[in-house]
């Protein structure tokens, strides 16, 4: 709508407009950005007013989301980052007795395909407002398109909605693989099944490839199906720790029993490309200034 709140006065005046009554969000502006693999990622950009309204409701929703979140969910959460997720990988996989098999999970178009009815039935917030945001549509090439599924990447509240849709997977796995010590019933343990998730990227560990294929994978697929989601066949695979796997820009493996965490080859290539861009765009400046 070409409206900017660029001054303190404009922002102060805008506060008085943030009312639920007669509020109707504008369609999102669709912009495609290119990912590192060459594919395009659609972003939905809301107006300033819609962004502010989402932020207002997020202030109430976020504390609720934190109380129901999986313990080992690290994406789009305060005081958590990729480093915490990688540290949890070290805790779960570094010991000699640690699980050896890993399911590398990637959800296909997570933000674009979350089922609207599931969100409306399960997200504890104003249903009228949530429905308006989910059904606001988007404009691309000057044409208006409806939104029948998904929550747009670019919306302030979208990461929290996606996280809440995926929360519960860890609890489900723990309930399934919970074991009670026969000799000491008060003690319990889990047979090396651990979930570590960052947004829509996750890994699940296990003692065997068969357990991942025959028990865990069907559970994950059923969990996602209820939310309108599926696993990416291209990116989801089962790997032995000795072969190593890439997760959040790092490569994690064991070599001759030693646990190693290094930057992934793709991360190294991305870093090299960035350096090349900087050098090529500053060819005329002195060497000491470039460094």
What residue spans do the PLM features occupy?
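Charged boundary/loop elements
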Residues: 59-72
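Conserved polymerase palm-domain catalytic core
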Residues: 17-21, 27, 31, 71-72, ...
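Active-site beta-loop-alpha junctions of metal-dependent nucleic acid enzymes
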Residues: 78-82
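Short helix/loop capping segments that flank catalytic or ligand/cofactor-binding pockets
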Residues: 43, 53-54, 112-115, 174, ...
